[in-house]
Regions:
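Glycine- and aromatic-enriched mobile tails/lids
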Residues: 5-9, 15, 59, 65-79, ...
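An anion/pyrophosphate-binding glycine-rich loop and adjacent beta-alpha core
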Residues: 1-51, 103, 112-118
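FAD/FMN-dependent oxidoreductases across multiple families
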Residues: 34-78
Length: 242
């Protein structure tokens, strides 16, 4: 895929980006107005200058395990969109399909909730340990994931990334604010991704292992992970039903 070639060039030449030549696209501003505006804001004129580009994560193919009605394993808790793992996208989402998924499953969930909504009850008292990460770990977490668990993965890079994440997880926050919750969510998602990527010893869709470049039939499975209230992770495999 294109992003692998870009990443390979960046690694070989030790550069943070490659150059995109869009100067031959006469109607660039009309076809890509958002990108054009962003380039101008950063002092780049796409009509006359090369654009620096690099791969970036913008979608998670996994998510909270749900059924075809968006119901999670927690009673009366539903999830849809990028939050959920419906299986609709397979191993790699096609552009714009996330909008269709959100519309379909969002409608299903809304209809079910509307039919079964009960009386409002008092909130449940929190009686479990709460993990809150220090917002300061956000940047090193993102760097570790991009370098070791991003476009190109291997047992070595993933193991090193997991070690970094475990160290970062020791930096916790005692202040329950938005930044703490956001980084906590990023941290737990990163852990789930790295652990699953280590288990999946093959390449499939957007998951590419340089040490296991082939796609294997025995890996037509979902990897389901669970984090218990004591912070312990467990994984199991579910064969995809045809």
């Amino acid at each position: 895929m294109l992003f692998r070639s870009i990443f390979k060039q960046m690694k070989e030449h030790n550069t943070p980006h490659v150059w995109l030549d869009a100067t031959k696209i006469k109607d660039f501003a009309e076809r890509f107005p958002t990108i054009y505006s962003s380039c101008l804001d950063n002092g780049i004129n796409p009509n006359t200058q090369l654009i620096p580009v690099s791969p970036a994560s913008h979608y998670a193919s996994g998510g909270v395990k749900v059924d075809l009605n968006g119901l999670t394993t927690v009673k009366n808790l539903y999830a849809c969109g990028e939050t959920a793992c419906t299986g609709a996208h397979g191993a790699n989402r096609l552009a714009s399909n996330s909008l269709l998924e959100g519309l379909v499953f969002g409608t299903r969930i809304a209809e079910i909730i509307a039919k079964n909504i009960g009386e409002q009850e008092d909130p449940i008292e929190e009686d479990q340990k709460i993990f809150l990460a220090d917002p300061a770990i956000k940047m090193p977490l993102q760097l570790a994931m991009s370098q070791g668990a991003g476009v190109m993965r291997s047992a070595k890079s993933l193991t090193e990334t997991l070690a970094i994440l475990e160290k970062l997880g020791q930096h916790q926050s005692t202040s329950p604010r938005i930044e703490s919750w956001e980084v906590s969510n990023l941290y737990q998602l990163a852990m789930a991704i790295v652990k699953a990527a280590l288990l999946r010893q093959e390449s499939r869709g957007s998951h590419w292992r340089s040490d296991f470049p082939e796609t294997l039939d025995i890996w037509q499975k979902h990897i389901v992970q669970k984090l218990d209230s004591d912070g312990n992770w467990s994984s199991r495999e579910e064969v995809v039903q045809k």
